[in-house]
Amino acid sequence: MGTRWFAKNTTMSKNSIVIGVDLDGVCADFYGRMRQIASEWFERPIDELPEEVSWGLSEWGITNPSQYDSLHRFAVTQRELFSSMEAIPGARKYLRQLSDEGFRIRIITHRLFIHYFHATAVQQTVNWLDSHGIPYWDLCFVKEKTQVGADIYIEDSPENVAQLRGRGLFTICFGNSTNRHIEELRAASWQDVYDMIKAFVT
């Protein structure tokens, strides 16, 4: 199955290729910022919260979805999570390079999950993208990422990677501790992402 995602596409022109880019965990350091906020939320020294986590953050003492939702809601509404994350190294550089080469960058994120907070979530997202110099052609707020019609996807969520690949879509898994079980293609850095995209279209 791993080699399936190395197959080259010889029918695409760079100027027509849309790259669907996840935001949290791919462009923005979601887990790094959440760790800071969780330290405050649980009133625990940050050194007690491991940097290496699994999906659901059980390593920080979260035992059920309700606890995760409470922490996440606090992070978003009270600590401006969407506008306070650091950029993942290389995201700005290589997305700008891909954009300059004619690829269309489509940012795809599922952030409209808190009722009556949509306008703020959108504004924080746009402000973050602009302040970090992340280029994009489109910005899509959607849960089902297969619906956005990209040619290449960069994603870190194990569920989303499986769903996209299940539809036969070329998907690069941006590696972190939550998705180590996911097969190739895997990128350990944004330079890896860039090299994989170039290999796919060359």
From Swiss-Prot:
Its cofactor is Mg(2+). The active site is at residues 22, 24. The keyword tRNA processing does not apply. Transmembrane segments: none annotated. It is an enzyme of class 3 (hydrolase). Gene3D superfamilies: HAD superfamily/HAD-like. Its EC number is 3.1.3.-. GO terms for molecular function: 5'-nucleotidase activity; metal ion binding. One of its GO terms (biological process) is pyrimidine deoxyribonucleotide catabolic process. Keywords: Hydrolase, Magnesium, Metal-binding. CDD domains: HAD_5-3dNT. Mg(2+) binds at residues 22, 24, 156. Belongs to the 5'(3')-deoxyribonucleotidase family. Dephosphorylates the 5' and 2'(3')-phosphates of deoxyribonucleotides. This is Putative 5'(3')-deoxyribonucleotidase. It comes from Chlorobaculum tepidum (strain ATCC 49652 / DSM 12025 / NBRC 103806 / TLS).
